[in-house]
């Protein structure tokens, strides 16, 4: 079931509320992209009720939700999507009819050093959530929007990847777990008629992003006069999208997207990692030659990802935030905030090759019986 936005000729399609309010479960909503989407939906559609479930992992923060946490149409639940009992309770008690599944471990470097944690969170977590949706007794899920990544396509040196013509050939443990999770979603759609939509997005940047990712890490290090570590030669290219544009894309897909479809959420702004570092240095008045240092590359570093977003554009979405403005505002955000108010232990993320490992005392999530 899809909920279509109204649009006028020449305008950017924007979703409009249904007559009957939507009740959404947004997993991973205290993380980077999830928190921006939760904020957009809760403030744009006050008749919608947004339930955020987040286990507040190292890269999440309730402070990311400070604009909406006290709103009457927002409920926050601290919990792990791997907990079948918890998710089932939330689905039934809140009468959820739409699920937006953002919860995931997403840092490629970490996946090389701690790959099983990615399997537990990204694959097993998705399976538990799907099974809870299938077994919910007090509600019926009308849309399960699964958030995936362009990395499931694998390296692409030439053409852009399209949703239904490109094979999934993931090249790192993170991408493999996301590809596996997609297969589960599709299987539940086919086997149990669960209405689903899958999105595959490219690199997103902006405020509230945990500093293990390149742009916030570069901004913090350069502002301190420290070296920016570049993996390998730095000539791998990535496409970058500001989080405001990404959040609007999810809004449009939620309301205008067709079920059983996949939508790429991609930017045309393609840059090498080295050029990104130089742009950050330029904003901060630093000499790149003195600031950038090349270090050992990842175990495998895809040279290029590029995706075709024609289907998303057909829904009316357009990219609004250009690279120059978006990067400058992002660098300013990370260099003028008390970052420890968001993430107490973020300093370890600034290492050239960070490795996060889950706490030994993490409570095991109960599995469905």
Question: Could you tell me what each predicted segment is?
Answer:
Residues 2-4, 12-204, 329, 337-346, ...:
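N-terminal Rossmann-like NAD(P)+-binding domain of SDR-like oxidoreductases, especially those catalyzing
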Residues 180, 184, 188, 218, ...:
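Hydrophobic alpha-helix immediately C-terminal to the catalytic Tyr-X-X-X-Lys motif of short-chain
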Residues 84-85, 97, 109, 116, ...:
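Residues in well-ordered alpha-helical elements
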Residues 41, 188, 217-222, 249-253:
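A short, amphipathic alpha-helix embedded in the catalytic core of nucleotide-handling enzymes
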Residues 79, 222-369:
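C-terminal substrate-binding subdomain of Rossmann-fold SDR/epimerase-dehydratase oxidoreductases
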Residues 178, 200, 208, 238, ...:
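Short, cationic motifs built from Arg/Lys/His that form the positively charged side of catalytic pockets
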Residues 68, 159, 211-219:
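A glycine/serine/threonine-rich, flexible loop-to-helix segment
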Residues 166, 170-177, 207, 211-215, ...:
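The catalytic Tyr-centered alpha-helix of NAD(P)H-dependent dehydrogenases
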């Amino acid at each position: 079931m899809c909920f279509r936005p109204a649009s006028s000729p020449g305008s950017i399609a924007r979703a409009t509320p249904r007559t009957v309010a939507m009740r959404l479960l947004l997993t991973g909503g205290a993380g980077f992209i999830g928190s921006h989407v939760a904020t957009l939906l809760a403030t744009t559609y006050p008749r919608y009720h947004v339930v955020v479930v987040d286990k507040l992992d190292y890269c999440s923060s309730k402070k990311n939700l400070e604009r909406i946490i006290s709103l009457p149409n927002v409920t926050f639940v601290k919990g792990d999507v791997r907990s079948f009992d918890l998710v089932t309770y939330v689905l039934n008690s809140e009468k959820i009819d739409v699920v937006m599944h953002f919860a995931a471990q997403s840092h490629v470097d970490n996946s090389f050093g701690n790959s099983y944690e990615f399997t537990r969170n990204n694959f097993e977590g998705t399976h538990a959530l799907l099974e809870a949706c299938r077994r919910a007794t007090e509600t019926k899920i009308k849309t399960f929007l699964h958030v995936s990544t362009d990395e499931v396509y694998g390296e692409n040196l030439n053409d852009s990847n399209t949703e239904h013509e490109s094979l999934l050939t993931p090249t790192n443990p993170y991408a493999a777990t996301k590809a596996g999770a997609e297969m589960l979603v599709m299987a539940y759609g086919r086997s149990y008629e669960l209405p689903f939509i899958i999105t595959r997005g490219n690199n997103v940047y902006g405020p509230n992003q945990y500093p293990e990712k390149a742009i916030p890490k570069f901004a913090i290090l350069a502002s301190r006069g420290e070296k920016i570590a570049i993996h390998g030669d730095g000539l791998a290219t990535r496409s970058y999208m500001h989080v405001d544009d990404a959040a609007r894309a999810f809004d449009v897909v939620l309301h205008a997207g067709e079920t059983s479809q996949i939508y790429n959420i991609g930017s045309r702004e393609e840059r090498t990692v080295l050029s990104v570092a130089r742009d950050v240095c330029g904003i901060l008045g630093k000499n790149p030659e003195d600031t950038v240092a090349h270090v050992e590359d990842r175990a495998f570093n895809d040279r290029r990802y590029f995706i075709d977003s024609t289907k998303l554009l057909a829904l009316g979405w357009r990219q609004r935030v250009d690279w120059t403005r978006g990067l400058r505002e992002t660098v300013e955000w990370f260099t003028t905030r008390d970052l420890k108010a968001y993430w107490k232990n973020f300093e370890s993320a600034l290492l050239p090759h960070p490795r996060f490992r889950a706490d030994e005392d993490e409570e095991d999530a109960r599995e469905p019986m």
